[in-house]
Amino acid sequence: MAGMTKQRLQPAEPSRGETLDADEVVFLICVEANPLEVQAHLLCASLRRFGGRYKDAPIVAVSPRPALALSPTSQAALEALGVTYVSMPLNETGSPYGTINRIVTGAWAEANLPQPYLVVLDTDMIFTAEPCFLRADVGVRPVDMKGSATGGEGDPLDDYWTRLCGFAGIAPSTLPPLETAIDRIAIRASYNGGFMVVRRDLGVLRRTRDIFFASLEENMRPLAGSGVNVFASTGLVGVEASEWWGSSQAALSIAIWSLTLDVRLYDNRYNIPAHLLRDRSWPLPAGYEPVLLHHHYPLEREYHDPLLGTMRKLACSQAVLEWTQAQLAGLTLR
């Protein structure tokens, strides 16, 4: 993997010209009438409370499967936070792999929203401090674990990645080396799909859709036959959906490097995998607090204490802890 282009790391203190203004961004999430509802409310409320310069930026929440559109009550709760809610038939695949929602919603947003930058987030996230979004074609975080990624030639998954690269017209060697965030394994670039900042007119998300749907047409499941049943923030996703796990991130990573070299890696303050830190440390830049937690927890009562415990471990401020605890207590009443 020697000789590949390296991604640029996010500076701890970017200059004013490197930072996106609030009127340049729109936040994009997917939400459905399932456990995502309460997660979306918590995420949007945290942005409004702790988002700093971005706290009043527009948020668009999309239900891409109208059969799972939000109830009027849930819609009103999001609208009270200044969220624009959209329900339209973007995902008509019938696939149990729910991440297709994010793929088709991102492609729709690139074609239809006016802001020059999209901040695409999974719903199972919480802002704990003001973010700083960088003026780059793409901003991302590495995947947490190797999972469906490839370490390069000789890796059992390299043929899968090579075929995906072919859909984008690039060689696998185009993908730069990267280290996974948790298990620290060397891989070809694979980015977490739950946090990305993309320049809208570049078309990364539409190309991601095209690559993924080409793989769907060929039934290319990276974890086919593994027997894995992934536990996600909506619960166990099922064996069939699990066989596709990581495929959206592969398509995204290949789409990025087929279109640009201007890629920024955000540091450890962003997309913190809270669900994996109960028995692990998580180094933060000296003197800085966590910004964005990706908790991956269903928000039932049994997961509140583990989430709050990890937030204390990360040294989230007392104000953030008290606010989150109050929000979680309120969610149990919904």
Model-derived segments and spans:
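Glycosyltransferase catalytic domains, chiefly GT-A lineage
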Residues: 2-334
